[in-house]
C-alpha cells in the first residue's frame, strides 16, 4: 500500500483559535496557515473527506481548509510505509513552522 503526505491551506480565520496560536509561537504574520497530514488515499480524496466532515480529528481542515498545496508535498509522495509517511508529516510540519507558517497536525 502506498502512503502520501498532503498540505491543505487554511483560511487566516484559524488564527483566532487559542490552540492554533499556541502551537505556532513563531508564526510570521502574512505567511500561510496550513494543515499537514498523511493518508493511504490520494491527497485529493483525503481533502474531500476533510471537507465532508468525515475526519473528526481534523476540525481546522474541515472548517478553514480551502485548497491543497501540492507544491509543498508532491516531491515526497508516494511512500511505502505508514511509519515513513508519519515521520515525513512531522518533518514537513517542522520545516514549515521554521519558515514562519502557521501549522496544524494531529
Give the residues covered by each predicted segment.
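GIY-YIG nuclease catalytic motif and its immediate N-terminal context
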Residues: 1-48, 80-90
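Aromatic/basic micro-patches that form nucleic-acid/chromatin recognition or nuclease catalytic surfaces
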Residues: 41-44, 48, 55-106
